Amino acid sequence: MNLFSIKYSLRSFSRDLVRGWWARLVIYPRISRNEFSPMELESYIKPNLNKTKVSIPQATTLQKLGSSSGTINKDDIIKNSKSFTQPYSLKTLLRNKISTSGSTGRPLTITQDLGTAVKEEAFVYRQLRWAGYQHGDRRAWLRGDVVSNGKPYRGIYGCRDWWSNTLMLSSYHISSHTAQNYLSALKDFNPILIQAYPSSIYSLASWMLANKVCYSGNSLRAIVTSSETLERSVQECIEQAFGCRVFDWYGQAERVAAIGTCEYGGHHVLTDYGRVELLSDSDDLYELVGTSYNNKAMKLANYRTGDLVRLNSEVCPCGRTFPTVDTIIGRRDKKITLADGRQIGRLDHLFKGMKNVVEGQVVYRGENQFILRVVAGPDWRTADAELLVQRLNERVGHVVANVEIVFSIPRGANGKFEFIRIEEDA
């Protein structure tokens, strides 16, 4: 057992002790009753709606907003977070802060109470149950965690989380040279479920199809993706390579809306997670506007997520009560291809929790050369720059990285922020 195994096993044990058991044994049984019973669903959300002081909508349909009046967005929270943070009470006495930079590179800190973390785990667990997973089953994890020092340990870039029976694999070391190592590790572990970034599992799947390699594990029931937009072409590639259905989970650090995929591929808006309304954007696209039911420490109402969905009028054959959308149009980060062939997707972890970063952008110049562009806050120090470079090297290995302080980061022609910018021809 290496140090990474000890670290992640202890982390899982402590999380299970604090929130996991409560989520699975108390919250999950209650919310599972909402799936096929409109009456149970209405009964569950009614007290939540009363507390948020909004009217009760049809729980099985999505309401459309006439205008953006009365909505809030990320900028409002960043500028005045204290106005959204609630005073301490008995129910919110235990709280913590979670940080994200998302697709904008602008660090955002959300205060959440312990009950929020417990309920979040319960809702995610319900999604995993839809995919055929039960607690204790073998699971593989291919996301943004630093689980390797850059060298394979017993042939794999990763470690075992013994407490949760999980094979933790690095999403930063996948390349044409290492893909077979990953597949061999998956075959030996033979997981029931794989949880992954779409870009990470897609890198393996596309290599498998290009090299006519079949997945040889015989227990895999499903792959659950999250944290990035899952394109349909990417989903089809993954399903073809691994021979199982891909389930996708949509959520955000603000905890105002969630969408889960069922066994028929329907994208269900979980109306027992938060109150979701639709704000017309363009053509047939609508922005998700959510009101949190779960977080009592930081109440967010009518929050514009910035993520778009396309509606449909079909009834999902699974029979669940939750309304569906056709597709989710969220973040589309570029992928960086390093000199050794590794493809790197999400790097927003670099800026998480960086209080002195107003905005951040990752620029790749080719040949393992990075520029980390930063709009710095007034308390910026040299140590902040050193920490950013250290975080980058922890994830992608030893590369050349420089921090560039700028007054602003230009938007593209469409006015959108480009979190990962590739300037290899510069």
State the predicted function of each range.
Residues 194, 284, 296-399:
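AMP-binding/adenylate-forming catalytic core of the ANL superfamily
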Residues 118, 140-200:
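AMP-binding/adenylate-forming
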Residues 221, 225, 230-315, 332:
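Conserved AMP-binding/adenylate-forming
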Residues 180-183, 187, 212, 348-351:
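Short hydrophobic/charged patches on amphipathic alpha-helices used for structural packing
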Residues 138-140, 289:
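Conserved beta-strand elements of the Class I
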Residues 1-99, 105-138, 145, 188-195, ...:
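Nucleotide 5′-phosphate-binding alpha/beta core
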Residues 157-158, 212-215, 264-268:
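Short, hinge-like loop/turn segments at secondary-structure boundaries
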Residues 171-178, 191-235, 248-253:
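Adenylate-forming
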